[in-house]
């Protein structure tokens, strides 16, 4: 997928809040910590051959790898901190610290590991990365993409409000419904929907709390969404941004990721609206690539995704929002792209699913039931049909990541 350096991956979901706080000793919220624990082996499926994954819980990891067919088993090592500290730099060469998302806290964790003797190269944190992660960057990118694609329907660029009064002014002069977002958030977090121009007391308290913590909130009209999709990219940090693939995905009503489609890229493109099956798709890809080259190409090095959507206009016609969100990190969409390329049979279609269970034990029971109900079938070294877990599932697990292929 990328460069000559071997990498040490680490799964740290929800890193945007850590970027916003900007502290090396930041502690993620409980849900992010639990997801990081339960899905920590997920980088197996997008890491390159010879890479390693830094895991905390070794119990079950080796058994999970042993349970995979040899032809499907990634050539990637799962290593705990003690094992990493025993590696020899002379033999191994330094491993480049590569978290799911760059943030001061995860880089500080890598640095502590390096000081214990692990042969790791830790990139430096830059305040410029914080600026790029702020939603204002996505808003500026939206403006640039719209200028490059005049054939798109006009889209309201998010407005950033520093007071409740500014929010009230916006909702009383524009047409409801609206979406408010905190500046450092993703995947349905930090989002409030206003169904009308009359702000309720709970909504006002949410806005006041967000303003106290972040200083601003963004607001924009809520569109009548009919489909989510994303374009995935890689930036080399020297001004070159390249297209990495298409992701078609599903979300909860509040925007949280639930699953992504798997299969041949041309077949996935065929699932999009008719307006994206012609030349507009290629023009959109080019416009976004050029915008990213100008905006992030010389500052950020790594994978990134741009969330987009198809929506229904008042006259019933379909239109495209070309730049909902900028994700400066690995994404579930990129995981889906790699699973389609490496794991799923080219003649099959399926879904990557992320599920959260209410209590310990529920995830294991669901995993066992799915394994019995949809046994995996393989052809030509690929998953042709059935269920495949992407991570170990233990009695303590709450989160699952898995594939269902038909």
What are these regions (language model features)?
Residues 252, 323-337:
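Glycine-rich phosphate/pyrophosphate-binding beta-alpha loops
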Residues 345-406:
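Peripheral (often C-terminal) accessory segments that flank ATP-dependent C-N-forming ligase machineries
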Residues 2-52:
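N-terminal-proximal low-complexity accessory segments that begin disordered
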Residues 32-42, 54-169:
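Conserved N-proximal alpha/beta basic substrate-recognition cap immediately N-terminal to
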Residues 203-258, 309-323:
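Phosphate-binding site of ATP-dependent enzymes
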Residues 214, 243, 255-318, 356-383:
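A long amphipathic alpha-helix within ATP-dependent nucleotide-binding catalytic cores
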Residues 171-193, 212-225, 325:
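ATP-grasp fold ATP-binding core
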Residues 158, 177-203, 230, 253-272:
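Glycine-rich phosphate-binding loop of ATP-grasp-fold ATP-dependent ligases
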């Amino acid at each position: 997928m990328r460069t000559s350096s071997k990498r040490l991956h680490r799964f740290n979901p929800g890193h945007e809040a850590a970027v916003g706080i900007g502290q090396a000793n930041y502690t993620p919220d409980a849900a992010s910590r639990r997801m990081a624990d339960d899905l920590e082996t997920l980088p197996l499926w997008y890491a390159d051959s010879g890479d390693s994954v830094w895991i905390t819980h070794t119990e079950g990891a080796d058994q999970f790898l042993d349970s995979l067919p040899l032809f499907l088993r990634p050539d990637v090592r799962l290593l705990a901190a003690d094992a990493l500290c025993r590696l020899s730099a002379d033999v191994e060469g330094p491993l480049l610290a590569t978290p799911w998302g760059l943030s001061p806290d995860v880089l500080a964790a890598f640095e502590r590991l390096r000081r214990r003797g692990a042969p790791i190269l830790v990139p430096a944190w830059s305040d410029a990365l914080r600026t790029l992660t702020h939603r204002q960057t996505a808003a500026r990118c939206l403006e640039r993409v719209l200028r490059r694609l005049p054939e798109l329907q006009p889209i309201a660029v998010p407005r950033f409000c520093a007071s409740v009064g500014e929010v009230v002014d916006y909702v009383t002069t524009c047409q409801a419904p609206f979406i408010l977002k905190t500046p450092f958030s993703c995947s349905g977090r930090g989002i409030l929907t206003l169904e009308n121009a009359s702000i309720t007391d709970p909504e006002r308290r949410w806005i006041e709390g967000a303003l106290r913590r972040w200083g601003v909130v963004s607001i924009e009209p809520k569109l009548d969404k009919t489909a989510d999709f994303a374009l995935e990219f890689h930036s080399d940090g020297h001004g070159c941004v390249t297209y990495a693939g298409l992701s078609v995905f599903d979300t909860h009503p509040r925007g949280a990721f639930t699953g992504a489609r798997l299969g041949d890229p041309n077949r996935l493109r065929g699932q999009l609206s008719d307006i994206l099956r012609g030349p507009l798709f290629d023009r959109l890809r080019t416009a976004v690539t050029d915008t990213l080259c100008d905006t992030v190409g010389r500052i950020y090095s790594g994978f990134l995704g741009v969330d987009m959507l198809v929506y229904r206009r008042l006259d019933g016609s379909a239109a495209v929002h070309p730049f909902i969100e900028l994700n400066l990190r690995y994404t579930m969409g990129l995981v889906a792209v790699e699973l389609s390329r490496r794991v799923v049979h080219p003649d099959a279609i399926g879904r990557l699913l992320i599920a959260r269970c209410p209590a310990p034990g529920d995830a294991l029971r669901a995993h066992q039931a799915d394994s019995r109900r949809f046994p995996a079938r393989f052809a030509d070294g690929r998953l042709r049909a059935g269920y495949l877990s992407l991570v170990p599932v233990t009695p303590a697990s709450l989160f699952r990541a898995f594939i269902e292929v038909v």
